[in-house]
């Protein structure tokens, strides 16, 4: 017995093929390395942005501490002037001083209230600056007028730095320089990848194929395996490969120039930060000594005035000098702490809060 199947006007085929590049003139490997280096460069760029943000937050926090301490200085100044006014008023009532001295004391007290009001407003503004640096926002009604409490004081803790060591640390640790070094290596790999266009490529392939015949019988089909090696080589491409190589080399040279420029900028930043640190150190040491002398001057002026050998002008002048000395000391401590943080950042060191 025989069975026949009618002819069909449809044929179909299934083909599964896999290939693997064996040799591509180093292009594939260079492309993978280049992509990895670019990814690493992006991570270093993020690290640099984080360092900048942390420095901004630390500087803003020091600004809050400075503004808060200035309020204390102005409050102490006002308290001393009020005590002096009370002393003058008592003497005026006793008839030992003129109304002029009493009036002068009242004017001094009134004038002392102005910088206190300014200091309190500066404190509120410093908090807003810190809030912006932190990216902190709140729409709660109860928090709009609330002033947060800040822990810490504006202290002077001497730290030693050496200029040559700072240069070395900056060249090694700065994420901006590391990023450009990664990009330079990536551009070198891009040149290698571009050169691979002038070299042959060799690939191994294998596959399986099923082809259906021209009848409705499923047995009317053929299938089989295929394994082989193939090669391609663009002998002439209108100098397209040469153009890509030239372009890749141009980008490489631009990246190298950018790296050199960044290294010079980092060196200048280290020098500037180191100079500011030196200045801040000298000012902090000097202001500490002057404040002690100004406090002693106020004590002696009050003693001489109470003994009748000094004048009210001596007391007021000494008090002004003390307030100026205390303010300068706070400003010097603030400048020193900011200078240390800026120098650490210029050297590529992470913020102390991160390292600790």
Language model: regions and residue ranges:
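Transmembrane beta-barrel architecture of outer-membrane proteins
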Residues: 11-13, 59, 104, 224-226, ...
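Residues on the lipid-exposed face of transmembrane beta-strands in outer-membrane beta-barrel proteins
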Residues: 16-20, 130, 229-233, 332
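Small/polar (Gly/Ser/Thr/Ala-rich) solvent-exposed segments
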Residues: 2-9, 19-48, 178, 197-225, ...
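Short, charged, amphipathic alpha-helical segments
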Residues: 33-36, 99-108, 312-320
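Amphipathic alpha-helical coiled-coil segments
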Residues: 49-75, 83-85, 90, 126, ...
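Periplasmic alpha-helical coiled-coil/stalk elements that build and connect Gram-negative outer-membrane
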Residues: 49-169, 273-276, 280, 322
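Long amphipathic alpha-helical coiled-coil segments
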Residues: 129-137, 342-352
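Bacterial Sec-pathway N-terminal export signals of envelope proteins
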Residues: 11, 17, 21-22, 150-184, ...
């Amino acid at each position: 017995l025989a069975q026949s199947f009618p002819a069909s006007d449809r044929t179909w085929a299934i083909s599964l093929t896999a290939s693997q590049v064996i040799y591509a003139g180093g292009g594939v490997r260079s492309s993978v390395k280049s992509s990895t280096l670019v990814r690493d460069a992006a991570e270093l760029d993020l690290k640099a942005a984080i360092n900048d943000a942390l420095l901004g937050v630390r500087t803003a926090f020091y600004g809050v501490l400075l503004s808060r301490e200035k309020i204390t200085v102005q409050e102490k100044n006002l308290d001393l002037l009020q005590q002096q006014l009370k002393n003058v008023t008592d003497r005026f009532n006793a008839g030992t001083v003129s109304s002029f001295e009493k009036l002068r004391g009242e004017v001094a007290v009134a004038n002392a209230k102005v910088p206190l009001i300014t200091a309190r407003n500066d404190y509120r503004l410093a908090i807003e600056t810190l809030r912006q640096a932190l990216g902190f926002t709140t729409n709660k009604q109860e928090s709009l007028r609330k002033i947060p409490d800040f822990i810490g004081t504006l202290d002077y803790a001497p730290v030693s730095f050496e200029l040559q060591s700072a240069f070395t640390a900056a060249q090694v640790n700065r994420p901006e320089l590391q990023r450009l070094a990664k990009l330079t290596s990536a551009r070198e790999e891009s040149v290698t990848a571009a050169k691979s266009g002038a070299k042959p490529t060799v690939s191994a392939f294998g596959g399986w194929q099923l082809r259906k015949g021209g009848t409705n019988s499923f047995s009317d089909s053929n299938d089989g395996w295929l394994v082989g090696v193939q090669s391609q080589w663009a002998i002439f491409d209108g100098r397209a490969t040469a153009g890509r190589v030239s372009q890749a080399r141009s980008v490489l040279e631009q990246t190298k120039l950018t790296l050199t420029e960044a290294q010079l900028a980092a060196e200048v930043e280290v020098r500037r930060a180191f100079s500011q640190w030196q200045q801040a150190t000298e000012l902090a040491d000097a202001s500490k000594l002057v404040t002690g002398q100004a406090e002693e001057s106020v004590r002696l002026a009050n003693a001489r005035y109470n003994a009748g050998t000094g004048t009210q002008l001596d007391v007021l002048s000494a008090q002004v000098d003390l307030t100026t000395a205390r303010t300068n000391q706070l400003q010097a401590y603030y400048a020193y702490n900011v200078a240390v943080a800026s120098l650490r950042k210029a050297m590529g060191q992470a913020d102390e809060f991160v390292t600790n």
